[in-house]
């Protein structure tokens, strides 16, 4: 009787089409597999989205201190016009007031390296905000030049701490593929602060001389208030946590800031290797190693310190601080029109830094530096020619404003953000905080020297002659980038260290973790 039963799948004796049980089973398996893959893909996309938002929030809050520097640069360019009238300060006092912040901030930067290694990157940012708030409050109520300088000193120390630590922190929490994008946030916020300073100048310029500049300076306190909220959101740097032996805490942070668990574990392994090397080098103090460097560290210092100095000696802070003076030289005499023109400069600077953030990882650091330095050289030379031969007329005013905006645009597309990204990337873990502090010192010293001498030098060789000198220095920066600056895009911080040390084994442009292990063993043998 069993033989007379129709076979399922052959259609015998039944009115149904033949269906194979095996095929039907395979079909359901494929459907289950597709559904599982789709679910896994959705989960991966959701995690990637959460990771990007989390790292972006960390970079955002860590960069708030940089708004303070930008705001001070922008607001002081206009506030000083009213301070001169209210406190009756001289030209030399004006140069000291403007340029001293950069010189004073170097002490904050120098202290920042050791401070951040001791109390952590996160709490160093909090300290920076607190010190700046105190300084801004003192400046806002200052009855004399002397009290104004006391507030300026406190603000400078706070800015030095904040400017040094933000790029280091962001570089240490960011995933490799987007590190350039996130590490450029501090420069974005500096530019945003400059724009806010220019807008504040314009907004409060109609008030009385005694009140206007005080409100302009007091507004600078507001961004630092948000730092308190930031401390509730951002984690500590995983690399600092490993240095302190808190490996589990570091793993938790890396799980939040990397898109895949295996990537987080790989980064943790690299950091632990670097930290082990650091522990083996603790018998040699960091500052001694920086001041008496090995050939490899010397190469890193030349690149990091050199790019920081070139960023400032090409005259960008002179352009921003003294843009009203430059445009007055071109022919604009009305103060309100001068301050309105500076807003255009601030908008240009901010827009182009935003472009740079989206290009810095895809295009690379070095191509942006080429575009930036060559463009700045041309704009500075053309500005020099315009101020010397075409000033005081409509054409001269138009061209001067165009070339000032062009200069800040080319600066913002490359030299502005890439400088800080490179400095935070190229140094090994044991040196990173204090080497970055040393780079920030070079940056602030050069900025201060330019800002404190611009009016005097312009008086001696004219404003046009001063910008001709800046154009020559900018031309030298093109050569510096070509000869010495490496491409760091797409490499982890530990891989960049290996790139400077040489002898790497590369596969499709990547440095294998095995290379790091062999290099650490090799160094520990010596």
Swiss-Prot record:
Write the gene name: PLT4
Q: Name one GO molecular function term.
A: carbohydrate:proton symporter activity
The annotated regions of Basic and acidic residues compositional bias extend over 29-47
Q: Known Gene3D superfamilies for this protein? A: MFS general substrate transporter like domains (1.20.1250.20)
User: Among its keywords, does the record have Ribonucleoprotein?
Assistant: no
Write down any Gene Ontology CC term: membrane
Pfam families in the cross-refs: Sugar_tr (PF00083)
Q: Which CDD domains match?
A: MFS_PLT
Give the matching PANTHER family: PROTON MYO-INOSITOL COTRANSPORTER, SUGAR TRANSPORTER
Q: Write the record's keywords in alphabetical order, separated by commas.
A: Membrane, Sugar transport, Symport, Transmembrane, Transmembrane helix, Transport
- Topological type in the membrane: Multi-pass membrane protein
Q: Does the keyword RNA-binding apply?
A: no
In the record, the note on similarity to other proteins reads: Belongs to the major facilitator superfamily. Sugar transporter (TC 2.A.1.1) family.
Q: Which residues cross the membrane?
A: 63-83, 92-112, 125-145, 153-173, 180-200, 215-235, 300-320, 340-360, 371-391, 395-415, 437-457, 465-485
**Subcellular locations according to the entry:** Membrane
Name of this chain's protein: Probable polyol transporter 4
**What does this gene product do?**
Plasma membrane sugar-proton symporter.
User: According to the UniProt record, where is the region Disordered?
Assistant: 1-21, 28-47
């Amino acid at each position: 009787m069993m033989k007379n039963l129709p076979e399922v799948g052959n259609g015998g004796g039944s009115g149904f089409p033949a269906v194979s049980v095996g095929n039907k089973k395979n079909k359901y398996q494929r459907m289950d597999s597709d559904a599982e893959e789709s679910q896994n893909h959705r989960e991966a996309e959701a995690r990637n989205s959460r990771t990007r938002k989390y790292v972006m929030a960390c970079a955002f809050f860590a960069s708030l201190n940089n708004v303070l520097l930008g705001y001070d640069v922008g607001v002081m360019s206009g506030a000083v016009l009213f301070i001169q009238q209210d406190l009756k300060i001289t030209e030399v006092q004006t140069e000291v007031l403007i340029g001293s912040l950069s010189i004073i901030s170097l002490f904050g930067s120098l202290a920042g390296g050791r401070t951040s290694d001791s109390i952590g990157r996160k709490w160093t940012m909090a300290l920076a905000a607190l010190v700046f708030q105190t300084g801004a409050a003192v400046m806002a109520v200052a009855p004399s030049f002397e009290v104004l300088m006391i507030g300026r000193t406190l603000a400078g120390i706070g800015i030095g701490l904040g400017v040094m630590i933000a790029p280091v922190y962001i570089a240490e929490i960011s995933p490799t593929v987007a590190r350039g994008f996130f590490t450029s946030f501090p420069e974005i916020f500096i530019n945003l602060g400059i724009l806010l300073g220019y807008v504040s100048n314009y907004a409060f310029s109609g008030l009385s001389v005694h009140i206007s500049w005080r409100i302009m300076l007091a507004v600078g306190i507001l961004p630092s208030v948000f730092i308190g909220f930031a401390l509730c959101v951002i984690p500590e740097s995983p690399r600092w946590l490993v240095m302190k032996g808190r490996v589990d805490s570091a793993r938790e942070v890396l799980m939040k800031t990397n898109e895949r668990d295996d990537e987080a574990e790989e980064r943790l392994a690299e950091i632990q290797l670097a930290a082990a090397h650091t522990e083996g080098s603790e018998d040699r103090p960091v500052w001694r190693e920086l001041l008496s460097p090995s050939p490899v560290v010397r190469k890193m210092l030349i690149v990091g310190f050199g790019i920081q100095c070139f960023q400032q000696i090409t005259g960008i802070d002179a352009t921003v601080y003294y843009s009203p003076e430059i445009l007055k030289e071109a022919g604009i005499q009305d103060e309100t029109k001068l301050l309105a023109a500076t807003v255009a400069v601030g908008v240009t600077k901010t827009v182009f830094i935003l472009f740079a953030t989206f290009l810095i990882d895809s295009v690379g650091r070095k191509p942006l530096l080429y575009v930036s330095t060559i463009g700045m050289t041309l704009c500075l030379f053309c500005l020099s020619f315009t101020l010397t031969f075409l000033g005081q007329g409509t054409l001269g005013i138009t061209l001067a404003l165009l070339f000032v905006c062009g200069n800040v645009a080319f600066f913002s597309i490359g030299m502005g953000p890439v400088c800080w990204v490179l400095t935070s990337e190229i140094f090994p873990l044991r040196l990173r905080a204090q080497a970055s502090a040393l780079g920030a010192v070079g940056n602030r010293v050069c900025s201060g020297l330019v800002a404190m001498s611009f009016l005097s030098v312009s008086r001696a060789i004219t404003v046009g002659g001063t910008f001709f000198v800046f154009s020559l220095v900018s031309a030298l920066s093109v050569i510096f980038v070509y000869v010495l600056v490496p491409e760091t895009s797409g490499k982890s911080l530990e891989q960049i260290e290996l790139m400077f040390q040489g002898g790497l084994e590369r596969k499709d442009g990547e440095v294998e973790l095995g290379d790091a292990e062999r290099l650490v063993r090799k160094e520990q043998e010596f």
